[in-house]
Amino acid sequence: MCGIVGYVGQKKATDILVEGLSKLEYRGYDSAGVAVLEDNKIKAEKHKGRLANLEGMLNENPIEGGIGIGHTRWATHGEPSDVNSHPHLNNKETIAVVHNGIIENYNELRNWLMEKGYEFKSETDTEVIPNLVDFYYKGDLLDAVMEATKHMEGSYAIGVICNDEPEKLVAVRKDSPLIVGLGEKEYFIASDIPAVLNHTREVYLLEDKEFVVLTNDGVTLFDEEKNPVEKEVYHITWNVDAAEKGGYEDFMLKEINEQPKAIKDTMTSRIMEEKEVTLDDISITKEYLDNVDRVYIVACGTAYHAGVIGKYAIEKLVRIPVEVDIASEFRYRDAVITDKTLIIVLSQSGETADTLAVLRDGQAKGARVLAVTNVVGSSVSREANDVLYTWAGPEIAVASTKAYVTQLIAMYTLALHFAELKGSKSVEEIEEIKKAMLELPEKVEEILKNTDLIKEFAVKASTEKDLYFLGRGMDYGVAMEGSLKLKEISYIHSEAYAGGELKHGPIALIEKDIPVISLLTQRELMDKMISNVQEVVTRGANVLGVCFKGDMEESKRKMFEGLIEIPETLSLLSPVLSVVPLQLFSYYVAKAKGFDVDKPRNLAKSVTVE
């Protein structure tokens, strides 16, 4: 992985490829490269490091030609290096390939090809693909790619060009996203929509094992048996400007500030006072819910933390047992799944490999799967039984912010919808929650206007090596997200602990002047959290507290080095507000350390490999 772009047209391919790859930089990468057909011969340029390195080399050594493929790599097999970068060529340098995914049987294929006389330069799994295509090439590139994929196990989205058919680009996907852009006498492939937005809003969303041939005359689609495929054109509706910084210094800061709108958009037409929750893409009935004996919420990373909050909300409002699990763990633990199981999967991109695997495994065992995702047309959205979209808009920064808060809104919305169906809460209780939800955008805006204390504490914390987050109940779920954000972009070691677990080990880590952030928005647990704060302060910690305005007694304020007071809301909904200071805190720590907050090291936006 990480980013693929391909182009067929009359313009200079390298310009289109580099521009497209720049729109995919947010996905994370460690090297970049292109291969273009110039005078019926493949010319490739690839380098470790930033896209600017590649662009500089292409300025020094221009490559002409209107057909080419490009790639930004995030290392999975082989260290980041020039030789391991994509595109990869066959031994004769007549076939070039870019690839996202993992070829699981690449060692077997590599050994088999070596027995046939092929040699390998890199440590990557991808290099087997051009040589495998070469082995099966008999004058038709599509046939060769089709035959090669029959022997490839794992996940892949690939783009292929060949000297012998210089007018053609062939691509295919399996368990890794790939779209086809339809322009005016020019055509594209890409691993994500932003790469083609400057050129077209009309795309095909490829399904697994669909092949596509791009030429100057148009686009032809085939299934794995080489039968022609007719597809509906998907029109991209969101604005190109949504994928630009719009005057902000960083995408992350822009996206933090877009949260009020994202929250409002995700509730629009769904949450209304004195009206039942409206979810058009979900056909779950009261009869179905009455038969459900357990709910699993499954996700990865930040989405998992949203799932933790979802568990609290659904259990509280719907009174159905809920388990929340990490997708990469859940899929291997032989969970009890029947036709009475509802699985809720969360994935910002809709392409997270482990989450997709859970979706498919769950359906195979008879479960119904409901997906919460931000990307219309993604694999998760197409394969799930029901879909709830989070209308966060494009999220470019690797560290998720607005996608997370809209996932929270989605989970609350689901919980309310299920509660209405089952009658598990009174109309008055549900109306109180709806009213409070509709007030959240304005309250987030209020937090965003008061950042001085957050900045001050962040600058002090930026020189520390360790930092801890504490919380109980829903606050613990938010603490986990705050800790992850800090790790992701500031590279400071951080852990989140449930307040009640302090005495069971973590308190041994507390020493003089160590920074601790304590969340205190769960009023029924306030006294217990105050005791936890006292425990760490006694041992020398400097504590920043997050609580509702007016909740902290004057006599207890002196324990805190600082106290961020957020607008009051229901304890159930507090994560939407309390996470915002933690996002800003992580942002300002990383900026104080001089780090790139949008593209943190070693991380990718969309993890499409297992």
UniProtKB/Swiss-Prot annotation:
Domain SIS, first and last residues per copy: 284-424, 453-600
Phylogenetic placement of the source organism: Bacteria, Bacillati, Bacillota, Clostridia, Eubacteriales
Protein name: Glutamine--fructose-6-phosphate aminotransferase [isomerizing]
Keyword Nucleus: no
Organism: Clostridium perfringens (strain 13 / Type A)
Highest rank taxon of the organism: Bacteria
Intracellular or extracellular location(s): Cytoplasm
SUPFAM superfamilies for the chain: N-terminal nucleophile aminohydrolases (Ntn hydrolases), SIS domain
Enzyme class, first EC level, given as a word: transferase
GO biological processes: carbohydrate metabolic process; fructose 6-phosphate metabolic process; protein N-linked glycosylation; UDP-N-acetylglucosamine metabolic process
Matching InterPro entries: GATase_2_dom (IPR017932), GFAT (IPR005855), GFAT_N (IPR047084), GlmS/AgaS_SIS (IPR035466), GlmS/FrlB_SIS (IPR035490), Ntn_hydrolases_N (IPR029055), SIS_dom (IPR001347), SIS_dom_sf (IPR046348)
Keyword annotations of the record: Aminotransferase, Cytoplasm, Glutamine amidotransferase, Repeat, Transferase
UniProt GO cellular component terms: cytosol
Purpose of the protein: Catalyzes the first step in hexosamine metabolism, converting fructose-6P into glucosamine-6P using glutamine as a nitrogen source.
Catalytic function, reaction form: D-fructose 6-phosphate + L-glutamine = D-glucosamine 6-phosphate + L-glutamate
Primary residence: cytoplasm
GO molecular function terms listed in the Swiss-Prot or TrEMBL record: carbohydrate derivative binding; glutamine-fructose-6-phosphate transaminase (isomerizing) activity
